[in-house]
Curated annotation (Swiss-Prot):
Localization per record: Cytoplasm
Protein's recorded name: Aspartate 1-decarboxylase
Native source organism of the sequence: Chlorobium chlorochromatii (strain CaD3)
GO CC term, one of those recorded: cytosol
Summary of the function given for this chain in its UniProt record: Catalyzes the pyruvoyl-dependent decarboxylation of aspartate to produce beta-alanine.
Enzyme class: lyase
Stated family: Belongs to the PanD family.
GO terms of biological process kind: alanine biosynthetic process; pantothenate biosynthetic process
Length: 129
């Protein structure tokens, strides 16, 4: 049996901008992608902590160090600049692997600076800006 598990997440990111005219996606600072273990074109589930909305899209790599979290296309209607969101990726794995798998969690501050990261169930690793 195959299970869908949380692979990684960027927790409490702040939307910096939106572009309704873009063809779709979420643009994320490449440094944040690397720290969270996410890659361009990966499918994401996004939760808006301000209004409860959930939506799926895919990742576009943003400039390293830009702290950009931009919603593009229709996704720009799901959250406004300043809204707090959680960005999650998932993986499909067999039950035996899933039992020991630990997702990566990247915590960011109100300016999308990386604060800490940890594998679920393990101690947090502080990150300097």
């Amino acid at each position: 049996m195959y299970l869908h598990l949380l692979k990684s997440k960027i927790h409490n990111a702040i939307v910096t901008s939106g572009d309704l005219e873009y063809e779709g996606s979420i643009t994320i600072d490449s440094e944040l992608l690397d720290l969270a273990g996410m890659i361009p074109n990966e499918k994401v589930l996004v939760v808006n902590n301000n209004n409860g909305e959930r939506f799926e899209t895919y990742i576009i790599k943003g400039d390293h160090g830009s702290r950009e979290i931009q919603l593009n296309g229709a996704a720009a209607r799901c959250a406004l600049p300043g809204d707090e969101i959680i960005i999650m990726t998932f993986a499909v794995m067999e039950e035996a692997e899933a039992r020991n798998y630990k997702p990566m969690v990247l915590i960011v501050d109100r300016h999308n600076n990386p604060k800490s990261r940890h594998l679920v169930g393990e101690q947090s690793e502080p990150l300097s800006n």
